[in-house]
Amino acid sequence: MICYNKYGDWIRKRFGCKVQKISIDAGFSCPNRDGTIGRGGCIYCNNATFNPEYCTDTAGRVSQEERLNLSADNIRRQLETGKEFFSRKYPEMKYIAYFQSYTNTYGDIEALKRLYEAALSVENVIGISIATRPDCVSDELLDYLEELSHRTFLTMEYGVETFNDDTLRIINRGHSSECSINIIRNTHARGITVCAHLILGLPGEGREEILRQVDIVNSLPIDILKLHQLQITKGTILEHRPDLIAQCTLFTPEEYIDLLVEYIPRLRNDIVIERFTSQSPAELLIAPRWGLKNYEFTNLLEAHPVPPKGRVPPPLPPQGGVVSIFD
């Protein structure tokens, strides 16, 4: 059986109760879409694939300034809607406001403060988690976040995606691995909990490269790790780039488990793993189509026997079953 430091257990031990993250869309945009850093965004990104139904996606309909000014009440509404949904089963549950959609530090600092404080004003919200790009957190904002972390539970979730600079260029990420490393270290130095998000199976990254990067993860002050398999979804650049898809590893569940049973034991045992997979809506997902919910995959992984030492894992297929996309 695979053992690891589970996020659910870690957060429950920290607060002494069941805690649920509620995803919210605060109306942010992305500097890799609007021309500040780049245009078009990352090749795999379709924000609709991870937005819950209770989130209101305002991106693109009004200006960035208007979105942020309108969002404080909207944030409270989304949190109350999320609370209503989860409290039916767990009335005593506490909540973390998860700023998930797009780049949640991309805006005027005073506007950002209003949004974060609005979330914390909601009853039974005991902390916030802020997802953002490694190149979108200023020293001024870190000063505020450091102060905020003394008042509430705060996690900064950085979309690192990979530590390979060649891959970062291919996926049009718009930042370097050095940028990711520096912000992780700087955030940790402020006493703020750091979460790193990585995608496994990006163009050119097979088993060997994925496992190589575990050493980089272990060398950095990362508290929480979020992993997920690469998925090709509608409305993305990657959907229309069969040349890049051919360089990706589109795992089957069995192949992904086989990778993770080697990946997990290599991690520092103090690193908390929050998730292993992403589950895009069926109507948007092109490949790979697993037909599994996240918890179902995790159950399969946890039941998998630990591989014996010295075992050489079978090689992954070079195209991960990509051809079926175009049949």
Functional labels for PLM-detected ranges:
Residues 2-9, 13-20, 53, 224, ...:
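Auxiliary Fe-S-binding modules of radical SAM enzymes
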Residues 15-74:
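Canonical Radical SAM [4Fe-4S] cluster-binding loop centered on the CxxxCxxC motif
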Residues 20-24, 95-97, 128-130, 154-158, ...:
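Hydrophobic faces of well-ordered beta-strands that scaffold small-molecule active sites
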Residues 49-82, 86-109, 124-137, 153-179, ...:
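Core AdoMet radical
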Residues 86-88, 116-123, 143-153, 185-189, ...:
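Acidic (Asp/Glu)-rich catalytic clusters
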Residues 109-117, 138-147, 210:
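Distinct, well-ordered alpha-helical segments
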Residues 118-125, 212-227, 297-313:
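Structural recognition of alpha->loop->beta junctions
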Residues 178-238, 254-277:
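Conserved C-terminal portion of the radical SAM core fold
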